[in-house]
């Protein structure tokens, strides 16, 4: 049964989770980092580092995986509920913030396995997927700190922030040659110009220009 995201009470609760303990403002500065997205190889490294960080390592790695695969904003990630995860049909109901478009995303094998294990290990009986030590939803700031510490633990070459995972999703799918309109719907953009920035930088669109 898919959740009713038109319920004002539900949306109010989600908004409360997102606003509480917001992550620090990220700095967009070429002196701090060379780009605002991560590669798949870099995300794999971060997941491995996050998995090693104490008893919450499995949760941490799963959060990175889900955020990347579905292009989630940090607020969308920490607000994720179990009733948005349909294990029977292998789908995720993505409730977008910023008046974005809601959509149904397929869940891959690695995601399903990770989420099933996380649900088995979760003893608090919460409706939220990603919990803190106190059993409340992990905050955006908490996720940002975990991601930053994971990067520091492996001497990552530049500081990272959660939105880089969303950008990584956009650039990865654009470089795989997916249709811009489909990518717009997947990322929940209301305006296509926000999606075009990914396709404009996709090297794959120039494949075949030279036949050497």
Feature annotation, model-predicted:
Residues 1-212:
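Conserved catalytic core of the tyrosine transesterase superfamily
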């Amino acid at each position: 049964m898919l959740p009713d995201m038109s319920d004002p009470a539900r949306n109010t609760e989600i908004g409360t989770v997102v606003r509480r303990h917001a992550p620090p403002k990220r700095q967009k500065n070429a002196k701090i980092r060379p780009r605002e997205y991560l590669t798949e190889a870099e995300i794999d490294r971060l997941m491995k580092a996050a998995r090693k960080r104490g008893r919450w390592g499995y949760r941490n790695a799963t959060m990175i995986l889900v955020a990347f695969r579905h292009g989630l904003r940090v607020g969308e990630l920490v607000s994720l509920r179990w009733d948005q995860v349909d294990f029977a049909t292998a789908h995720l109901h993505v409730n977008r913030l910023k008046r974005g478009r809601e959509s149904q995303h397929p869940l891959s094998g690695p995601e399903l396995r990770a989420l099933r294990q996380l649900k088995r290990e979760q003893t608090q009986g919460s409706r939220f997927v990603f919990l803190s030590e106190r059993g409340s939803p992990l905050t955006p700031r908490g996720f940002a700190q975990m991601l930053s510490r994971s990067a520091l633990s492996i001497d990552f070459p530049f500081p990272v922030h959660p939105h880089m995972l969303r950008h990584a999703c956009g650039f990865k799918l654009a470089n795989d040659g997916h249709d811009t309109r489909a990518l717009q719907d997947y990322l929940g953009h209301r305006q296509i110009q926000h999606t075009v920035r990914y396709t404009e930088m996709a090297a794959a669109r120039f494949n075949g220009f030279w036949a050497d």
